[in-house]
Amino acid sequence: MYRLLERTLDRFTGLVEYQPTYPFAAPTWVYLVGAILIQQLATRWYRYYKSWVNVPVVGGHGIIGSWIAAFRWTARARSLVNEGYQKYGDFAFQVSTPTRWEVFICNDEMVREYRNFTDERFSANALFEAKYTVPGAAEGVHKVPVPIVAKALTWQRTRAATKTDPYFEEFVKELQHAFDAETKFENEDWNDLCCFATGTRIVAHLTAKSLVGYPLSRDTELIDLFAEYGNAVPTSGFFIAMFPQILKPFAAKFCSAPKISARLDRIVMDELRKREANPRSEPQVQDITDWITFWSRTYPGTYTDQDIARSVVSAVFGAIHTTTQVLVHCLTDLAIRPEYIHPLREEVETILNRDDQQWTKEGLESMEKLDSFVKECQRFNPLDAGSLARRATKDFTFSKGLHIPEGTFVFTPNSPVLFDEKHYPDAQQFDGYRFYRLGRVTGRPLEYKFIAANLKYLQFGDGRHICPGRFMAADEIRLLLAHILVNYDIRPKDDGERPPNWTFKKILFPDMKGMVQLKRRSINISQPN
């Protein structure tokens, strides 16, 4: 039997050479496969007991039961998380996956405690194998501290909100350039728009404008790499995570994310050398790269060009991946729900008329219905079944007595909460004005903005680890939708049907090839002066 298998492998892979056999002997590959199976069984047994947490189990108990649950996880992860939330939503539960146990914290008091832990206690870097995929954010390496990147983004947000600063106007022009460059519509009739591919590249342009500025924001090679990197990090991370620690460096060599990261590092370092040769004064700081460079000068000899480049590149994944997902859902949901088009367009045009046809940050923030529509699209199509994803870097015990061993992966439920009738009445129904009404009824509109977070809306995280780039993401999505509403009519491509979402483990993705159709309107008031 093994000889037949050997010949089959030899024919299809060319990796196994024929070896003469002897009584009680077997080819080397048989021993290798056996050793790998034993190693995997031993690893499974070790992980099962090491990361066991004393909370209810969803899907299966024991070694065999947890294996069955792990296979179920690949196809039905979101339903397993929902099952756990429905049964144990007042405390916590755990589910077995093919590589580990995952613990979900549901109790509000524990979530409040958990959301403010530092990276020294709970870290997010293991989720996408950051050591290999996002070196600028990895643990145990010399790097620009992550909070510094967050401060740089805050500086840029302040620029966007300052009326005398040209940054926001430049950002709008970059968006319009990116839209025209990436769509290339050839006629005035209906044109197909691939939401994911085009959306990814437009977001890549805007991310480049924010991080490295003009003219790199229009460099084709850089935009290609930004767009590829946003999708390469999670896929590479998932692949590397399947291997034991000793084999992860080897597995990483076959992944695209480390290679793209290295190429981006070189591009940013080349740009840094150009800027060093022609230094700018501090008032002329134009982008995140400039800001971090000036910050690093307060610590002479501490940070190299590679450290700065890696910190810039580490922001690319978060800036592109989630933003693009939400943007695609917004485009497809708008196309299949024409009842929202006129009211949203009217809101945008009213504010543009008020502001003399100028796009302003203040005007964008006044588009409350548009903001609500975007947030409802995100709620109705939640990217992940879990949120606040972290790995325990040391043993920890919550104030309620729950003990979390080192190495345990911890989450809070996300999609089950967003469809819980206790928190969102008529949760199964799409309501684009849901958050607009909540803001009006409560008199606290800021609490229901797209960028706002609370215990029942954790899609951007919360507490110490809330996403610092969510403001830029919100600007990109709302500006692009507003631009389309004013300049184009929109409709679904295929007989009114929405391109279907699909899932992989806990993650929900839009149809990567899904399309809508756009047709230019006769009135165009979107171009800035």
UniProtKB/Swiss-Prot annotation:
InterPro entries to which the protein is assigned, alphabetical: Cyt_P450, Cyt_P450_CS, Cyt_P450_E_grp-I, Cyt_P450_sf
Induction: The onset of expression occurs at 48-hour-old stationary cultures.
Protein name, entry field: Cytochrome P450 monooxygenase atmQ
Gene3D superfamilies: Cytochrome P450
Subcellular location as annotated: Membrane
Xref: PROSITE patterns: CYTOCHROME_P450
Molecular function GO terms recorded: heme binding; iron ion binding; monooxygenase activity; oxidoreductase activity, acting on paired donors, with incorporation or reduction of molecular oxygen
Residues bound to heme: C467
Top-tier EC class: oxidoreductase
Recorded coiled-coil stretches: none
Main location: membrane
Pfam families: p450 (PF00067)
GO biological process entries: secondary metabolic process
Named cofactor requirement(s): heme
Family matches, as SUPFAM superfamilies: Cytochrome P450 (SSF48264)
Record's GO cellular component terms: membrane
Domain of life the protein comes from: Eukaryota
Family under the similarity heading: Belongs to the cytochrome P450 family.
Regions crossing the membrane: 22-42, 51-71
Biological function: Cytochrome P450 monooxygenase; part of the ATM2 gene cluster that mediates the biosynthesis of aflatrem, a tremorgenic mycotoxin with acute neurotoxic effects. Synthesis of geranylgeranyl diphosphate (GGPP) by AtmG (a GGPP synthase) precedes condensation of GGPP with indole 3-glycerol phosphate, followed by epoxidation and cyclization by AtmM (a FAD-dependent monooxygenase) and AtmC (a prenyltransferase) to produce paspaline. AtmB is also essential for paspaline production, but its exact role has not been identified yet.
